[in-house]
From Swiss-Prot:
Enzyme class per UniProt: transferase
Highest taxon of source: Bacteria
GO CC field: cytoplasm
Keyword set, alphabetical order: ATP-binding, Cytoplasm, Kinase, NAD, NADP, Nucleotide-binding, Transferase
UniProt keyword annotation of Transferase present: yes
Family per similarity comment: Belongs to the NAD kinase family.
Major subcellular site: cytoplasm
Encoding gene (name): nadK
NCBIfam families (alphabetical): PRK01231.1
Keyword presence, S-adenosyl-L-methionine: no
Organism of provenance: Acinetobacter baylyi (strain ATCC 33305 / BD413 / ADP1)
Protein name, entry field: NAD kinase
Annotated catalysed reactions: NAD(+) + ATP = ADP + NADP(+) + H(+)
Length: 307
């Protein structure tokens, strides 16, 4: 993780705002940030969906896909899911993103609402840590023709949809046959996603700086099947075999598409990275302790001893 070195660090003049819909606390935080930024003389642009949430008129808006072209920084107010959704639209513009947590865990949206204005002021003055996160790109092909493609910041997941039946697929890495597996599916995760669904599936936690991809089987029929960590440049191919149900594949859990026998899912690193910003003092291991409850018992004992 690097200290502030973005060329735009001294020119955060145009600020984009994105908020999670249908949550009153998000609207309150958006209004607080909007008024603060305007008070600093900065130009604020809402994405079109977010503009419908706030009680302002005559605000400037831009579509989610174009917002990254017209702003120097995007502030996302919501949970990690909100930032995931925004990241996929913004990554091609290389626009820096920072998150205010109005969700649950907040691994990506790591600033508490109570600290938002103070932390944002630090970032606007050029005091921040730059955290470059890679994404995955996924293609579904049949007979060499691309049927569907998507990008993911967290993970690409092969799963059985609403069915309780296991699915049958073959895994190749860099053109080498690895195994054929009967399981509920496979999670292909970035380091960012290693603290999300992959963690729930028994996968390892990867430090965000690692150039690696984790492959986590979901309830495999073979007990010896374990998570595999491969290099970030690896080309992963999943081939669908005969199944009682139609498997599905999703990117960041946002949209699933059905797969047929013989379809292939190709997964590799996306050429662009997300420029995620953190305020000074950000510590990944502290985030793990806080979000995952590490040290809880020891901290409780220490509090009791100190009392």
């Amino acid at each position: 993780m690097q200290s502030a070195n973005l060329s735009s660090a001294k020119s955060f003049r145009n600020i984009g705002l994105i908020g999670r819909p249908d949550k009153i606390s998000v609207v309150e935080t958006l209004c607080l940030i909007h008024d603060h930024l305007r008070g600093l003389g900065l130009h604020v642009i809402f994405d079109q969906e977010t503009a419908e949430l706030v009680p302002y008129t005559n605000v400037q808006t831009a579509s989610r896909s174009l917002l990254g072209e017209v702003v120097d920084l995007v502030i996302v107010v919501g949970g990690d899911g909100s930032l995931l959704h925004a990241a996929r639209a913004l990554v091609r513009h290389h626009t820096p993103v920072i998150g205010i947590n109005r969700g649950r865990l907040g691994f990506l949206t790591d600033i508490k609402p109570a600290d938002a204005l103070f932390k944002l002021d630090q970032v606007l003055k050029g005091h921040f840590q730059l955290d470059r996160r890679f994404l995955l790109e996924m293609e579904v092909r049949t007979k060499g023709e691309t049927l569907y493609d998507a990008i993911a910041l967290n993970d690409v997941v092969l799963h059985s949809g609403k069915s309780v039946h296991m699915i049958d697929f073959e895994l190749q890495i860099d053109g080498q046959y690895v195994y054929r597996q009967h399981s509920d599916g496979l999670i292909v995760s970035t380091p960012t996603g290693s603290t999300a669904y992959a963690l729930s599936g028994g996968g390892p936690i990867l430090h965000p700086s690692m150039d690696a991809i984790a492959l986590v089987p979901m309830h495999p029929h073979t007990l010896s099947s374990r998570p595999i960590v491969v290099g970030g440049q690896s080309e992963i191919k999943l081939t669908i075999r005969e199944n009682r149900v139609l498997p599905m594949v999703s990117a960041d859990g946002q949209h699933s598409v059905s797969l047929n026998v013989g379809d292939c899912v190709h997964i590799r690193k996306h050429p662009f990275k997300l420029n995620l910003l953190h305020p000074p003092g950000y510590d990944f291991y502290m985030a793990c302790r806080t979000k995952l409850g590490w040290n809880q018992d020891f901290d409780l004992i220490k509090e009791q001893d100190d009392s």
